[in-house]
């Protein structure tokens, strides 16, 4: 029986064949650019894609809070193979195929946050809304995909992007840089999107105690859960809102990591207590 890990490894083995089939020769320049494949699409030459990838990688390393650069890095490094692998993972799953057919979007217009807040505290919907409120964020902050040529694959990237906050909610990881790096490490093992793996290098920007905590607590957690968990891109989150969140975690093989905000709060209290005793 295939495991989540073996399925993802099998995808790597088909890299050469997939790239040969799907990489399109793009004979255009700045003065001869083809028409976009979907609203908002910006076709890129290989040189442009490479420059954007390098620039966004350096920029996001210097400032991990630049969501626009992280989004650009995600798009420019996902082709020609990785976004197709993720799309194929959806095509091989009944729920994934339904998501591709329905093309749902996750915004404050498609989800009723007041309703989610009214659900029992143990539900997925309440957990998601409570996480948004706790972190002070909105589902409307995800930028639209621009640099992926294939229209269906562009939706796959958009879906991943809009589901990201659900990953935060079910793991409990906050949006601070330390929490984002931990979640990106988990996402890399689950999705194989290069940007998520490259984001781990931002750990060099953490304070020494944060970096030590990442290596000793959250990276081992990310490896365990990322390899064991099912493909999260195939979760129809809109249909899970009234489910028990712990049951869903168990079904997806997601281990909840230690609460990062609680860890940081206790450390601050310990430091204050130590200063008072001096």
UniProtKB/Swiss-Prot annotation:
This is Ubiquinone biosynthesis protein COQ4, mitochondrial. InterPro entries: Coq4, Coq4_euk. It comes from the Eukaryota. GO terms for biological process: ubiquinone biosynthetic process. Its main location: mitochondrion. It catalyses: a 4-hydroxy-3-methoxy-5-(all-trans-polyprenyl)benzoate + H(+) = a 2-methoxy-6-(all-trans-polyprenyl)phenol + CO2. Pfam families: Coq4. Keywords: Lyase, Membrane, Metal-binding, Mitochondrion, Mitochondrion inner membrane, Transit peptide, Ubiquinone biosynthesis, Zinc. It is a peripheral membrane protein. Belongs to the COQ4 family. It is found in: Mitochondrion inner membrane. Zn(2+) binds at residues 164-165, 168, 180. GO terms for cellular component: extrinsic component of mitochondrial inner membrane. Residues 1-28 form a transit peptide. Pathway: Cofactor biosynthesis; ubiquinone biosynthesis. Its cofactor is Zn(2+). The gene is COQ4. HAMAP family: Coq4 (MF_03111).
